[in-house]
């Protein structure tokens, strides 16, 4: 089981918008109150020439107008009022007749009401053209006057020609889809607003609006809600004629269910034909169906154990369902301190890296005695009383409730455990830590908990922090004192070790998974900006200064239709992270996500959960695999033991190659330590392969490993060899072995990462890395300029991961050998994904079929340099080097120089002894040379630059005779 589980912290953010419900309590005019309605033909018919009307006639006309409005609302299929009206309403006849016109219809049908098609199932923006059957005639009973007078060329009455025009009706203000604040600023131009913070818990804000010389105030939990509520108050007070949608916090409108279209004369299949009219008439003439009351399904009744959220809730539910009367009363009191008990002196001892106690660094202090409490639960009617004493009143309260449930209500231990587990799961992650949760549930369930922490046996050697191991022991008194133990591996701190054992105990013994115990409404509601603030404050234990700066006057990108916004997230005025988006909000969120990825190694996912029960240090540590941590400690221990044995000053600039078998057993092949240095070209002239060109910890370890490979090839026929013979005669690494590279520091790769400004191959200069040019230096140019272009370590690792680490010479006797894992013992300046891209993925994901795992430890390490030295398996000494000459400190050729490797290679069985030239021996590996040529061509095609090869006459054109 992974000892550091990788948690997906979480977040869920509800996006949605919609209009709030209307203030109408009956909800009869919900749709009509939000949209302005057009005047129907029935309402237009009431606008006639003014004449004397008696009081009785006025009442009749008002009733007719009200009845017409009700009829129009009834014809509206979206309005809920229409669903309550089952029978069509009729209009009364006018007192006066129409000269030369047909009489008014006595009833209005649903399918041809008004000029705006009120019987349509949905209110369309475009009104379909009416057919002849709809416009007039005996079927529709509708007539429109022509230019000569009434219908069918009848004369128009004279009294209509002199009808006076009344004043224009005021334009109705449309408040559809507008919030109270929007209405406020549209209706009133002179508005001043002011916000003040209201003291109290929770914190509130007061919004003060001054409009037309009047002052209005409202309070809410945030400024936005306070302004919306205050704006609603202003509009309702100063403009009562305007409909205001009430503002409610946290209410999102849900999508309405699709309304099935009804068949009427104005709709159907988009054609106005006689069949549609007949269908509409048939539907309108059908009798009104009787409402059938739906049979209510019986609600599922949960038992108190199934629904209780805590032990107190369980007891209250049982009492509510019980016929007997129970009156529980809690009493809590503080136990008086005994003056005779003195305060305890506590001494803390610091442990150095060698595990010895440092006497002069002891820190002493005084710890006050814990305050004890008495908690009592009384049942007066039953004459029962339960009392517990301890330091925590909350835990004591749960303990007395448990005793009452077991004794008085006969609740089983399994049911109490179920409710206690549910209670702990709900609290874990937002108001209790893992240790607090474990301590609480153990106290409630009558279990004895003991957590011990001590320095780990595999503590790191040399300069570094000590590692710790924790052991958690539980004795369950409900199960005949059953004992359960969990031990952690070596972790970087006591807190992390305790968190780990507590987490495993909750998961394996109490069936509580801390990774899934997330309060969705508190944690998941946070966006990337809020999550960044919370995690930074939790990490630094203080409020960090975070600012978001938007870049103005950014020129638009050619061919891009939308505007792009840029935002910088500035943390403590030093670190800057840039985000880009189509809006300022998206750019700000992107900048926060970049900061989360760089600082906490979190790829933000809106659908994920991010529990904050663990500390940020524990979250970062949980990203590291156990193999990476074990390899790092194993290599450090082996290196320091080697330097101590050979009396070599240690350095933390070292790298090692090792093999790991299926049983996770490890064997070191080679180690190297050195600063990065390039030997001068004059030193190589006439050296004949006896001088090292590039000194670096990884480069020296790789050359030493080649020498170890040659030593293992001499014993390839034995069972203990790491190689096995293939049919074609070449040897191959056994399939159960994995080659692992470990280095304390990651190689510089500023031009090789995926987000580099210029993605190019680079070579080493005395101060930094420089992008390669488009040409290669010749031998004469090197002699003239006295400069070499040697590729950086990251480029060489990229080449080895593509062609094999064995090189051209050993490809004559070996199949390609590739690195399986690359681990770095300190935190890299870039993410692990960028490192993996630089070391294996620069040509695309399809070019390299092998997956190489690249990881780095989240540890800050101070560089400590020493002399250059190396060691490999098969020799009993450490070789020290002089980086100025590329030879040993005594001036002799290094055992890993090209000449020494070539001489050891020629001693292998099956090697052509006639070939004494080093360059010619490398050319004999035809398959490797072909793959190398293709690799160089792909680099140029990808725009990464030209590989800087060195002239053969400078480094490879030597023979063993010349060397002797």
UniProtKB/Swiss-Prot annotation:
Protein name: A-to-I RNA editing regulator adr-1
Molecular function terms from GO: adenosine deaminase activity; mRNA binding
Domain DRBM: 179-240, 527-601
Domain A to I editase: 670-953
Domain of life: Eukaryota
Primary role: Required for the hydrolytic deamination of adenosine to inosine in double-stranded RNA (dsRNA) referred to as A-to-I RNA editing. Does not have deaminase activity but binds to dsRNA and regulates A-to-I RNA editing, possibly by modulating the accessibility of the double-stranded RNA-specific adenosine deaminase adr-2 for target adenosines. Regulates editing efficiency of specific adenosines in 3' untranslated regions of target mRNAs. Represses editing efficiency of the Y75B8A.8 3' UTR in neurons. Required for correct expression and A-to-I editing of clec-41. Required for normal chemotaxis.
Disordered: region residues: 1-31, 86-105, 149-176
Family matches, as PROSITE patterns: A_DEAMIN_EDITASE, DS_RBD
Tissue-specificity statement: Expression begins early in embryogenesis where it is detected in late gastrula and comma stage embryos. By the comma stage, expression is highest in developing neuronal tissue in the head, tail and ventral side. Neuronal expression continues through embryogenesis and, by the L1 larval stage, is the prominent pattern. Expressed in most, if not all, cells of the nervous system at all larval stages and in adult animals. Also expressed in the developing vulva but not expressed in the adult vulva.
InterPro entries: A_deamin, dsRBD_dom
Polar residues composition bias: residue spans: 149-161
GO terms classed as biological process: adenosine to inosine editing; chemotaxis; determination of adult lifespan; mRNA processing; positive regulation of chemotaxis; regulation of vulval development; RNA processing
Annotated localization: Nucleus; Cytoplasm
Short name of any one Pfam family annotated for the protein: A_deamin
Additional notes on this entry: Can prevent somatic transgenes from inducing gene silencing via the RNA interference pathway. This may occur due to A-to-I editing of transgene-derived dsRNA, preventing transgene RNAi.
Subunit structure: Interacts with double-stranded RNA-specific adenosine deaminase adr-2.
Keywords: Chemotaxis, Cytoplasm, mRNA processing, Nucleus, RNA-binding
Any one of the GO CC terms: nucleus
Principal location class: nucleus
């Amino acid at each position: 089981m992974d000892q550091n589980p990788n948690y997906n912290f979480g977040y869920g953010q509800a996006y949605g918008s919609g209009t709030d419900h209307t203030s109408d309590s009956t909800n009869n005019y919900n749709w009509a109150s939000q949209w302005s309605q057009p005047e129907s033909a029935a309402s237009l018919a009431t606008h006639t020439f003014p004449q004397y009307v008696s009081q009785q006639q006025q009442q009749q006309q008002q009733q007719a107008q009200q009845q017409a409005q009700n009829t129009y609302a009834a014809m509206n299929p979206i309005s809920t009022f229409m669903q309550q009206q089952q029978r069509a309403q009729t209009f009364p006849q006018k007192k006066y007749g129409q000269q030369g016109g047909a009489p008014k219809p006595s009833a209005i049908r649903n399918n041809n009401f008004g000029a705006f098609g009120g019987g349509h199932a949905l209110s369309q923006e475009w009104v379909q053209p009416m057919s002849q059957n709809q416009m007039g005639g005996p079927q529709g009973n509708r007539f429109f006057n022509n230019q000569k007078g009434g219908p069918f060329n009848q004369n128009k009455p004279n009294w209509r020609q002199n009808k006076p025009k009344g004043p224009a009706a005021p334009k109705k203000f449309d408040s559809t889809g507008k919030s109270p604040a929007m209405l406020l600023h549209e209706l009133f131009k002179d508005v001043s607003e002011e916000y003040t913070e209201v003291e109290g818990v929770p914190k509130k804000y007061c919004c003060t609006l001054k409009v037309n010389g009047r002052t209005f105030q409202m309070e809410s939990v945030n400024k936005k809600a306070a302004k919306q509520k205050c704006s609603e108050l202003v509009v309702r007070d100063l403009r009562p004629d305007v409909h205001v949608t009430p503002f409610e916090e946290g209410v999102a409108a849900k999508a309405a269910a699709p309304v099935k279209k009804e068949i009427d004369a104005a709709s159907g299949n988009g054609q106005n034909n006689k069949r549609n009219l007949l269908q509409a008439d048939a539907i309108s003439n059908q009798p009104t169906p009787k409402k059938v009351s739906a049979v209510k399904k019986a609600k599922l009744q949960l038992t108190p154990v199934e629904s209780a959220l805590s032990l107190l809730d369980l007891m209250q539910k049982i009492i509510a369902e019980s016929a007997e009367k129970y009156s529980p009363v809690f009493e809590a009191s503080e136990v008086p301190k005994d003056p005779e008990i003195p305060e305890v002196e506590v001494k803390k001892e610091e442990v150095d890296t060698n595990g010895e106690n440092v006497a002069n660094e002891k820190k002493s202090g005084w710890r006050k005695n814990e305050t004890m409490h008495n908690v009592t639960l009384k049942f007066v009617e039953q004459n029962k009383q339960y009392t517990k004493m301890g330091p925590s009143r909350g835990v004591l309260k749960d303990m007395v409730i448990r005793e009452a449930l077991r004794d008085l209500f006969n609740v089983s231990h399994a049911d109490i455990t179920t409710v206690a587990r549910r209670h702990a799961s709900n609290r874990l992650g937002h108001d209790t830590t893992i240790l607090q949760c474990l301590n609480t549930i153990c106290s409630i369930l009558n279990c004895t908990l003991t957590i011990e922490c001590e320095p780990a046996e595999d503590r790191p050697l040399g300069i570094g922090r000590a590692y710790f191991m924790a052991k958690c022991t539980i004795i369950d008194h409900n199960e005949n004192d059953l004992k359960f133990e969990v031990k952690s591996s070596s972790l970087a701190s006591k807190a992390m070790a305790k968190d780990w054992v507590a987490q495993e105990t909750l998961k394996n013994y109490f069936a509580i998974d801390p990774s899934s115990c997330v309060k969705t409404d508190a944690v998941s509601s946070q966006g990337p900006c809020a999550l960044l603030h919370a995690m930074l404050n939790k990490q630094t234990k203080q409020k960090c200064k975070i600012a978001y700066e938007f870049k103005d006057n950014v020129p638009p990108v050619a061919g891009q239709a939308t505007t792009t916004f840029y935002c910088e997230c500035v943390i403590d005025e030093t670190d800057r992270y840039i985000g880009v988006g189509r809006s300022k909000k998206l750019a700000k969120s992107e900048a926060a996500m970049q900061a989360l990825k760089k600082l906490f190694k979190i790829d933000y996912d809106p659908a994920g959960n991010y529990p904050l029960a663990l500390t940020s240090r524990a979250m970062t540590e949980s990203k590291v695999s156990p193999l990476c941590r074990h390899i790092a400690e194993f290599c450090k221990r082996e290196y320091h033991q080697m330097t101590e044995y050979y009396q070599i000053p240690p350095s933390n600039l070292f790298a090692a190659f090792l093999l790991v078998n299926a049983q996770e057993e490890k064997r070191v092949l080679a180690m190297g330590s050195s600063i990065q240095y390039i030997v001068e070209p004059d030193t190589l002239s006439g050296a004949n392969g006896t001088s090292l060109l590039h000194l670096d910890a990884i480069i020296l370890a790789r050359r030493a490993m080649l020498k170890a490979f040659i030593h293992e090839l001499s014993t390839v026929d034995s069972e203990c060899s790491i190689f096995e013979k293939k049919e074609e005669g070449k040897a191959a690494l056994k399939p159960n072995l994995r080659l692992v590279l470990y280095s304390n520091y990651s190689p510089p790769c500023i031009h090789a990462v995926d987000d580099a400004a210029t993605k190019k191959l680079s070579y080493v200069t005395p101060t930094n890395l420089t992008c390669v040019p488009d040409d290669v230096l010749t031998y004469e140019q090197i002699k003239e300029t006295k400069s070499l272009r040697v590729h950086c370590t990251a480029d060489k690792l990229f080449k080895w991961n593509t062609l094999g680490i064995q090189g051209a010479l050993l490809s004559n006797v070996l199949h390609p050998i590739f690195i399986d894992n690359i681990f770095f013992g300190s935190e890299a300046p870039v993410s692990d994904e960028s490192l993996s891209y630089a070391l294996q993925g620069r040509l695309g994901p399809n070019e390299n079929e092998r997956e190489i795992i690249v990881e780095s430890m989240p540890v800050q390490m101070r560089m400590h340099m020493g002399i250059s030295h190396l060691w490999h398996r098969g020799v009993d000494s450490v070789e020290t080097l002089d980086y100025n000459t590329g030879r040993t400190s005594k001036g002799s050729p290094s055992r890993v120089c090209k000449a020494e490797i070539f001489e050891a290679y020629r001693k292998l069985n099956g090697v052509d002894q006639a070939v004494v030239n080093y360059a010619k021996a490398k050319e004999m590996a035809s398959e490797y040379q072909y793959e190398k040529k293709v690799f160089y061509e792909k680099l140029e095609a990808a725009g990464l630059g030209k590989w800087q090869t060195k002239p053969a006459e400078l480094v490879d054109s030597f023979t063993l005779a010349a060397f002797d």
